[in-house]
């Protein structure tokens, strides 16, 4: 998958579904590096610290690296 960095000063909520009403799972800190597994309607599916869920793509910046 593509790597992104969480760009949300207050952190980014991971949810069970790609929906703002989806059940809250955990908070991803600002600057966390995530790998996007799937993309759906402005949401990214990712795994972080053993949890797999959805985060808002709006608060993710593409990681710049050696591509």
Go through each PLM region and give its residues.
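SH3-family beta-barrel domains
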Residues: 1-16, 26-30, 37-40, 59-67
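Short C-terminal domain-edge/linker segments immediately following a structured domain
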Residues: 36-37, 45
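A short macromolecule-binding patch
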Residues: 49-60
